[in-house]
Amino acid sequence: MKRVLIKLTGKVQGVGCRRTTLAKARVLGVTGYVTNCVDGSVEVLAQGSHVAVDNLIAWCQAGVPCTVGLRVDVEEYQGDDIYLDFSIVR
């Protein structure tokens, strides 16, 4: 299983970024969460098969719909949390 934290910066809040990321993650079979951060960014914790997680990363890097000036940073997630689905954390 592959686990990563994806940080999306730019104009990413208030544009449907979490909702579209939720939909894409579910289609790909990725579990975890997406949440708004106080610094104006969006954080995605993604876990699943290497192929599924890599596809979500590639989708983010190609430009999440409705975002402006998007920057995508990815790092391995060292936690041992197990998520059974993908959700929006408010």
From Swiss-Prot:
It comes from the Bacteria. Residues 3-90 form the Acylphosphatase-like domain. InterPro entries: Acylphosphatase (IPR020456), Acylphosphatase-like_dom (IPR001792), Acylphosphatase-like_dom_sf (IPR036046). It holds the Pfam family Acylphosphatase. The keyword rRNA processing does not apply. Its EC number is 3.6.1.7. The active site is at 18, 36. The keyword Zinc does not apply. Signal peptide: none annotated. Keywords: Hydrolase. PROSITE patterns: ACYLPHOSPHATASE_3. Transmembrane segments: none annotated. It catalyses: an acyl phosphate + H2O = a carboxylate + phosphate + H(+). GO terms for molecular function: acylphosphatase activity. Belongs to the acylphosphatase family. This is Acylphosphatase. It comes from Shewanella oneidensis (strain ATCC 700550 / JCM 31522 / CIP 106686 / LMG 19005 / NCIMB 14063 / MR-1).
